Amino acid sequence: MSLSVGIVGLPNVGKSTTFNALTKAQNAQSANYPFCTIEPNRAMVEVPDLRLAELARTVKPERIMHSLIEFVDIAGLVKGASKGEGLGNKFLSNIRETEVILHIVRCFDEENITHVEGGINPLRDVEIINTELILADIEQLNKKIEKLSKEAKANQKGAKENLELANSLLAHLNKGLSASSYPEKESQSYQALIKELRLLSAKEVIYGANVDEKGISEDNDYVKALKEYAKKNKHEVIKLCAKIEEELVGLSDEESHEFLSSLGVSESGLNQIIRTAFAKLGLISYFTAGVLEVRSWTIKKGWKAPKAASVIHNDFEKGFIKAEVISYEDYVNYKGENGAKEAGKLRLEGKDYIVLDGDVIHFRFNV
């Protein structure tokens, strides 16, 4: 499943540092000058899930395998990116290939770290990026309208209706509003248009408020302003300190927990971001549990059992017979498959069963 999260923001706001912390490696170049990242860095990142550890305590497998999500570190955008400034066209194209945007916003003062706009103002920074995304969408939509106009004149099926929708959406964008706030965004025709054009401002957005160490336990004024803005626009803000997240890379889970506790927080901002991005992509996890491995498998919410089985192997879908299903809670509470079975908690589900997040499944198949 090639779904990914694009990390964007102005230059020098902490994108590459965040990416390095996400991947637990020094993959992305990070420096105190604009455009130190040009080609996008890509990495598969484990999705933190405490349920795997609980399952492992019951099964005692040889290994634990987490679900994965792809993050893409995209070079810093600047004002005028939609017109090609700062290699903007290339970078906007990189964003178009992703499904969710993680927008890193600088929310701390530090004289030794330059800011491309000369000073710290999170809302200004957010609007710069949003404006560039909208302008790029307007250009994309104008090209589509030109094509639809010709098709409508030729009386091609559906062209007039699609042209009307495209013009309505264009008027919306020209007001400086994002495609994600379009009133008719739930309509099938809108969804089809968005899928075709991959409009940037239609994507789900998570704001990563990059703070200094002092801002971790208590929101500073920058974070408060960003949260108020995001709430109005129905987006989420997750606070992180990219510098500290990078320092956590070399620590064990126990050491990380102690370090974070000393700062007054229970969980790293990056873990929250990963889980939120996973949900924004419409993904859930089901589990397989055996002595060789306990594993989390990634599927789209709403998938039926045969389709869910295909992520293990295509033969599982082709030869699907039944799915033996135990809920995560029952699996843990009754100490594994045998206990759950004795308690009557194991269910046999057919091809129309919609897999739920946290299901522990054994597939029966024949090929």
Across the structure, where does each feature detected by a protein language model lie?
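Short, glycine/charged-enriched secondary-structure capping and boundary segments
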Residues: 22, 84-87, 116-119, 220-224, ...
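Conserved Switch II/interswitch segment of TRAFAC-class P-loop GTPases
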Residues: 43-48, 75-85, 96-159, 172-186, ...
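A ubiquitous short alpha-helical element
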Residues: 59, 129-133, 242
